């Protein structure tokens, strides 16, 4: 399985990679624009991402906007199943959570700092990790 980490903070990228590296082939990008490019490339190479972990607050293109673009691509290309996308953010704000799920159609949401336990719990819910 393949995972894409979309995170602008170095330490967060390093921690998330350490949590996922035994479960997934992991790629890392630093903003939403690169996330959309990596997503497209994965499908063009017939090697799509099973999981995308995406920060919300990032430079250039934020996580919610990037997720909307990814979902639009999935619809245009009739890609099924859709990628599982877990949004990560330091903002524990109900409005941001709702926007992630309803505007971006996120699969899950984790408030930072992300722990191994919270990430694995989300992966279990999304059936990407067995108990």
Go through the PLM ranges and name each one.
Residues 80-82, 92-108, 121:
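Alpha4 helix (beta4-alpha4-beta5 surface) of REC/receiver domains from two-component response regulators
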Residues 10-31, 104:
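Two-component/phosphorelay signaling modules centered on CheY-like receiver
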Residues 43-53:
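Active-site beta3 strand of CheY-like receiver
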